Each structure stands twice: as structure tokens, then as C-alpha cells.
Curated annotation (Swiss-Prot):
Cellular component, GO annotation: extracellular region
Family that this chain belongs to: Belongs to the peptidase C58 family.
UniProt entry keywords in alphabetical sequence: Hydrolase, Plasmid, Protease, Secreted, Thiol protease, Virulence
Native species: Yersinia enterocolitica
Designated name of the protein: Cysteine protease yopT1
Origin superkingdom: Bacteria
Job description of the protein: Cysteine protease, which is translocated into infected cells and plays a central role in pathogenesis by cleaving the C-terminus end of the human small GTPase RhoA/ARHA, a regulator of cytoskeleton. Once cleaved, ARHA loses its lipid modification, and is released from the cell membrane, leading to the subsequent disruption of actin cytoskeleton of the host cell.
Pfam family, one: Peptidase_C58
Length: 322
């Protein structure tokens, strides 16, 4: 009996052990499946948190303004969040990688950096990314304000920043820049006309040269692409025999457009402003020409037709303050 009992006991023990092993395996499978579900849920949760953080970053209410309201009681413009804001932030990031190369090249051609500014990064990007009409950039409005400030013998950056140093923005100037860009982006308007009207109200008008008893403007349009920037450069430097002039330069390509500006003076040289890189000065036109053709055009990536390297329009302006 003992041996029999012993025999059955062993069988029963083995059966019990097998059952326990099967049970343990099933339990482990359930736990493993549960772990996968938990890890998947956590991964999804982390993605949601990252997206939420990105949205909050884009819509952050962190104040960088000298005060909450403009002089006439208006608040800093913002719109509802859109996923395009994230896309534009990525594009700005790519462009911002070109800033060091462009700035470092200025001194190599005898130029000086008057002010380091870039709408593609930092505090200014944080401000324009808050509104869908300025998220892609505010280059047109920035150039218009730069021309006005320069014509008045002032610096745009003294007007934009408290104390003329990067940090807090003066809301009146920031609001004005953003609003001009927003006005020019409306579906039923021509942005060039909006800018021209704004400049005219600020004492700056398009140059007109008398030809055959007519007074046409001296706007110039042309192509870059495979031709390179020579035609564009000639249009920028041409002062039409007057010796000076403000230039608003629009560059366009297959997928985007960009505005830059310049003040050209036969005696004092060229002051150049690109909202993506800052304000630079060259004491003579020859220095500027070499820099623009041999360095800037490629370092900025503006030579790519897919970007803004296909065609251009150059507007010339006169000012009462000149």
C-alpha cells in the first residue's frame, strides 16, 4: 500500500506540479499581456503629454511684454491653436540653423553686424507663433517697420525692445508689426498694396521717375533660379541717379516667399535687413555686392527654387525724412 500510495502520490504530485506550471504559465501570459497593455497605454499617455506640452508652449501666456495693453487698450494678438503652428516652428528651426554661417560671413567681406535679430527663433518667434497669420513669419511687416524707423533716423530694435536690448518687448511696436502682417494676409487683399498704403501713411512713398510726361513707379521684377542673383542685386543697388533709396525686396519660389529690405546710399554704402538674420552694414556697394553674391545667397539657402529662389520684385521708396 505504501508503495502503491507512493506511486499514486508521485503521479498526483506530478499532475499537480504540471497543473501548477500550466496555471503559472497562463498567469504569466495574462500578466505579460497586461504589461503590454499598460506599456502601450503609458506610451500613448506620454505622446499625449508631449503634444499637450507642445500646444501649451505655443500658446504660453508667459509675458515678455512691457505691459499688458497697447497705448490704445489692445491686447497682444493670438488665435486658436492649429497644427500648422507646429509645422511652421519646424521650418523656422531649419532656417535658424543658417544664422551662424550668414552672420560669420559678414566680417569676411568688410561688413558689420548692427543688430542680431532672427524671427526664426527665440522670444520673437514665441510671439508670432501665437497667431495663425503670423506663425509662418512676419517678414513683410518687419521690413516695412524697419524702413520707417530707419527713415526717421531711429532703430527698429530700439522701438521693439525695452531699452533697445533683447528681453521685454514694447507692446505698441510688437502689436503694430503683427497687425500689419495679419492685415496683409486677409483673403480679399493684396499684401503689397496693404504695405504700400501703410508706408505712405508713415511718410514713405514709392519712387516715381518721369518718363515721357508720365510718372511710373520704378518697381523691378525678374528671375533668379539658374540665372543667379545678379539681376536681383542690380535692382537692389540701382538708385536711379538720385544717389539713395529704400528697397523692399520680395523673393519667391515654388513653395514660399520672403521679404528683405535695404537702404542704399552712394556715399555711405548699404544697410541691409533680413528678418531671418539681422541688420548688417557695408561701407560701400562693392563690398555688399561680393558678400551678397558669393556668400549670402547660398548660405541663406535662398538660392533653392523650392524655397524662395525663383523670382523677385524690388520696390524703391523715398522718404520725407531723408
Amino acid at each position: 500500500m505504501d508503495s502503491i500510495h507512493g506511486h499514486y502520490h508521485i503521479q498526483l504530485s506530478n499532475y499537480s506540479a504540471g497543473e501548477n506550471l500550466q496555471s503559472a504559465t497562463l498567469t504569466e501570459g495574462v500578466i505579460g499581456a497586461h504589461r503590454v497593455k499598460v506599456e502601450t497605454a503609458l506610451s500613448h499617455s506620454n505622446r499625449q503629454k508631449k503634444l499637450s506640452a507642445t500646444i501649451k508652449h505655443n500658446q504660453s501666456s508667459r509675458s515678455m511684454l512691457d505691459r499688458k495693453l497697447t497705448s490704445d487698450g489692445k491686447v497682444n494678438q493670438r488665435s486658436s491653436f492649429t497644427f500648422s503652428m507646429i509645422m511652421y516652428r519646424m521650418i523656422h528651426f531649419v532656417l535658424s540653423t543658417r544664422v551662424p554661417a550668414v552672420r560669420e560671413s559678414v566680417a569676411n567681406y568688410g561688413g558689420n553686424i548692427n543688430f542680431k535679430f532672427a524671427q526664426t527663433k527665440g522670444a520673437f518667434l514665441h510671439q508670432i507663433i501665437k497667431h495663425s497669420d503670423t506663425a509662418r513669419g512676419a517678414c513683410e511687416a518687419l521690413c516695412a517697420h524697419w524702413i520707417r524707423s530707419h527713415a526717421q533716423g531711429q532703430s527698429l530694435f530700439d522701438q521693439l525692445y525695452v531699452g533697445g536690448r533683447k528681453g521685454k518687448f514694447q507692446i505698441d511696436t510688437l502689436y503694430s508689426i503683427k497687425q500689419l502682417q495679419i492685415d496683409g494676409c486677409k483673403a480679399d487683399v493684396d499684401q503689397d498694396e496693404v504695405t504700400l498704403d501703410w508706408l505712405k501713411k508713415n511718410g514713405i512713398s514709392e519712387r516715381m521717375i518721369e518718363r515721357h510726361c508720365l510718372l511710373p513707379t520704378v518697381d523691378v521684377t525678374g528671375t533668379t533660379g539658374s540665372e543667379g542673383p545678379d539681376q536681383l542685386l542690380n535692382a537692389i543697388l540701382d538708385t536711379h541717379g538720385i544717389g539713395y533709396g529704400y528697397k523692399k525686396i520680395y523673393l519667391s519660389g515654388q513653395m514660399s516667399g520672403h521679404t528683405i529690405a535695404a537702404y542704399v546710399n552712394e556715399n555711405s554704402g548699404v544697410t541691409f535687413f533680413d528678418p531671418n538674420f539681422g541688420e548688417f552694414h557695408f561701407s560701400d556697394k562693392e563690398q555688399f555686392s561680393k558678400w551678397f553674391t558669393n556668400s549670402f545667397w547660398e548660405n541663406s539657402m535662398y538660392h533653392y527654387p523650392l524655397g524662395v529662389g525663383q523670382s523677385f520684385s524690388v520696390f524703391t521708396f523715398d522718404s520725407k525724412e531723408v
